[in-house]
UniProtKB/Swiss-Prot annotation:
It holds the Pfam family Trp_syntA. The keyword Lyase applies. It comes from Yersinia pestis. Pathway: Amino-acid biosynthesis; L-tryptophan biosynthesis; L-tryptophan from chorismate: step 5/5. It catalyses: (1S,2R)-1-C-(indol-3-yl)glycerol 3-phosphate + L-serine = D-glyceraldehyde 3-phosphate + L-tryptophan + H2O. GO terms for cellular component: cytosol. Belongs to the TrpA family. The alpha subunit is responsible for the aldol cleavage of indoleglycerol phosphate to indole and glyceraldehyde 3-phosphate. This is Tryptophan synthase alpha chain. GO terms for biological process: L-tryptophan biosynthetic process.
Length: 268
């Protein structure tokens, strides 16, 4: 959890926002996945948001579903994902690593065991996409027991009670949802609602990162202008992977260019 606090402190000192890429672990293969993640970090990613491939991802659009299918085709399992995570942490000791995943994978070997594994490999936060806040108590308790930040989604229509709960129980960062629906770069994120960011700040919530539909530098600038601490981009990055599966060198060149441009937009 401290890695997020350190990151936001360093970025504030430099007057920068955070740019956080999302990819599926093991897509398109475990070895290439590690190359991709190294490339994202070298190009300026401030933190990582990583998915563990799941067969029935309710919140994901086709781009991220296809990434899971590629990982499955390469034989990726949750166990292999944890090996990849351990390797990332060994190489990159300070970058915050977040998981974005589904409850079934957490339940599989018991909630406590899951968070224990996360702690062992150096994961900082876990967001469970299909667990609403009101059902999150056992997950947050296990997360905090193992020093993992429980991350909550703040939807665009959040009422005051939910904002207070998220502020009170969330750690690390707050996932500010651009809009309802599924992930996808073609579904442009609406600008974050300033009043949500203001309220979250008033209630001392963890810094807000805006996600869903963030695919160009202007959207990163707009997120920061509305008071968010940064932006998360997933589908746009996964699309670059998808289009270049057969040409890995070109893939890494395009990923570097994309992340460099998105990160540049976080500098005022």
């Amino acid at each position: 959890m401290e890695r997020y606090q350190q990151l936001f402190k360093q970025l504030a000192a430099k007057k920068e926002g955070a740019f956080v890429p999302f990819v599926q672990l093991g897509d398109p293969s475990p070895a290439m996945s590690l190359n991709i993640i190294d490339t994202l970090i070298a190009a300026g990613a401030d933190a990582l948001e990583l998915g563990i491939p799941f067969s029935d991802p309710l919140a994901d659009g086709p781009t991220i579903q296809n990434a899971a299918l590629r990982a499955f085709a390469a034989g990726v399992t949750p166990g292999i994902c944890f090996e990849i995570l351990a390797e990332i942490r060994q190489k990159h000791p300070t970058i915050p690593i977040g998981l974005l995943m589904y409850a079934n994978l957490v339940f599989h070997n018991g909630i406590d065991h899951f968070y224990q594994r996360c702690a062992e490999v150096g994961v900082d936060s876990v967001l469970i996409a299909d667990v609403p806040f009101e059902e999150s108590a056992p997950f947050r308790a296990a997360a905090l027991r193992h020093g993992i930040a429980p991350i909550f989604i703040c939807p665009p229509n959040a009422d005051d009670d939910l904002l207070r709960e998220i502020a009170s129980h969330g750690r690390g960062y707050t996932y500010l949802l651009s809009r309802a629906g599924v992930t996808g770069a073609e579904n442009h994120g609406q600008l974050p609602l300033n009043h949500l960011v203001d309220k979250l700040r008033e209630y001392n919530a963890a810094p807000a990162l805006q996600g869903f539909g963030i695919s160009e530098p202007a959207q990163v600038k707009a997120s920061l202008a509305a008071g968010a601490a940064g932006a998360i981009s997933g589908s746009a990055i996964v699309k670059i992977i998808e289009k270049n599966v057969a040409q890995p060198v070109e893939m890494l060149v395009q990923l570097t260019r994309f992340v460099t441009e998105m990160k540049a937009a976080t500098r005022s």
